[in-house]
Amino acid sequence: MSFLTTPKMLSEYQCLKNIGFSHKTVLKRRLFRKECTPALKSFYSTQDPALNEVRTEKLKNGVTYVCDPRPGHFSGLGVYVKAGSRYETKKFSGVSHFMDRLAFQATERTPVGEMKAKLENLGGNYMCSTSRESMIYQAAVFNDDVKSMSKLLAETVLAPKIQEDDLVHYRDSIIYENSELWTKPDALLGEFAHVTAFQNNTLGNCLLCTPDKVNGITATSIREYLKYFYRPEHLTLAYAGIPQEIAKEITKELYGHLPSSSLPPLEAIPSHYTGGFMGIKKSEAPPVPYQQEFTHVVIAMEGLPVTDPDIYALACLQFLLGGGGSFSAGGPGKGMYSRLYLNVLNQYPWVETCMAFNHSYTDSGLFGMFVTILDDAAHLAAPLIIRELCNTVLSVTSEETERAKNQLKSSLLMNLESRMISLEDLGRQIQTQNGLYITPKEMIEKIDALTPSDLSRVARRVLTGNVSNPGNGTGKPTVLIHGNVDEVGDVFALCKKAGIGH
């Protein structure tokens, strides 16, 4: 057994691998870690269970922070900003995409070289991503480096250095990213499904900065974006594995000085589900490095927001349908007994991919299926999807319900074993649910309570267009076709005949 994996170190080594630490970093930190302060040493100690409860507090200026103090070998830090593509007006369209390019680069106080050196010396894992409803900044570090990483995180969120010279490089990378999207059908379908389902509003705003808008993004527009969205009341901080008193101290030190914003609150525009059709013929798509021989079809309906009581039933329904690619290594927990594997992928060799999806947001959602099918069989894609969707209303057995519940629970709990994922769950719950945090135990109890009739009921509610969300959606199907558009046929007529949508 190597030095890195002696029994004494095994648990820490495994944990570090899970969040992306390298072998060199583990060894370096083991041999050369500086002595921890008494407060930071307590991260590893067993504490009173009452001290391990998740707590939330709001500063006077509006900054909210939440802390899960349960100790571990490393700690998680996150900043979640109420920003993203759904909040973009015409003036700020595409700016969110530039924000993740600016993360962990030069700041007003730290040159880019020094920033990179500090991050490398910390040896942690850090990231920034843009979603439709949030800008996410996260890091996982050793416990004795929490304060150092917190300062770098605050710098990159509050004071990124924005220079026109740097934007030239970011524009090129964003244009390249847009071109790459056309070579990844899964990502392409997900993005265009939102654009079609919520046309010209909120969740339908493109997550990427489109090529026609790239050159219009300037240093001035980014600074205005920062001023408008990065206000104290829009910031939610999350801490995992950090004692409450240290989390409070860090928050007040780094964010307590921010003045309350004098700007008016963001206009609360509800997400209006429109449904609709988008067809992309091969001749209309940009050229790709290979000849596309598949047609991709999506059929979706308005889903449920994260606060809807039926959200667990709909998530379970997604696992019941399941699906995936035509090739799978198999094995326990792979979903090989889900309906889409049994009824579609294992039956029809001309189906490359068939999968159910479920996206939930603060006030709406998107639920449906997509299939990737050989061009010669394109006319069979829509009937396949509609058949499987309708069967969830007609019949759901106890056996497949229990299987789907177990898969949902295992997926939830295994994901939460990751420090970064549990951190995001903590921060995003507080941000999207007005400070409410639902524990994993409570989620499991809600999943356990589901019955086959619950799944059929929520399937009927969604597929018939009877979802009542704040945006008063149309209840019409969303249909997206990429490939042999004409061969797929009249999908709306098939949906109407099957009773899907209004």
Curated annotation (Swiss-Prot):
InterPro entries: Metalloenz_LuxS/M16 (IPR011249), MPP/UQCRC_Complex (IPR050361), Pept_M16_N (IPR011765), Pept_M16_Zn_BS (IPR001431), Peptidase_M16_C (IPR007863)
The keyword Hydrolase is assigned to this record: no
Gene3D superfamilies linked: Metalloenzyme, LuxS/M16 peptidase-like
GO biological process, one term: protein processing involved in protein targeting to mitochondrion
An example Gene Ontology molecular-function term: metalloendopeptidase activity
Record's keyword terms, sorted: Mitochondrion, Transit peptide
UniProt cross-references to PROSITE patterns, sorted A to Z: INSULINASE (PS00143)
Pfam families: Peptidase_M16 (PF00675), Peptidase_M16_C (PF05193)
Annotated Gene Ontology cellular component terms: mitochondrial processing peptidase complex; mitochondrion
Subcellular location: Mitochondrion matrix
Function per UniProt: Substrate recognition and binding subunit of the essential mitochondrial processing protease (MPP), which cleaves the mitochondrial sequence off newly imported precursors proteins.
Description of how the protein assembles with itself and partners: Heterodimer of mas2 (alpha) and mas1 (beta) subunits, forming the mitochondrial processing protease (MPP) in which mas2 is involved in substrate recognition and binding and mas1 is the catalytic subunit.
PANTHER family named in the record: METALLOPROTEASE, MITOCHONDRIAL-PROCESSING PEPTIDASE SUBUNIT ALPHA
Stated name of the protein: Probable mitochondrial-processing peptidase subunit alpha
Top-level taxonomy: Eukaryota, Fungi, Dikarya, Ascomycota, Taphrinomycotina
Gene name of the record: mas2
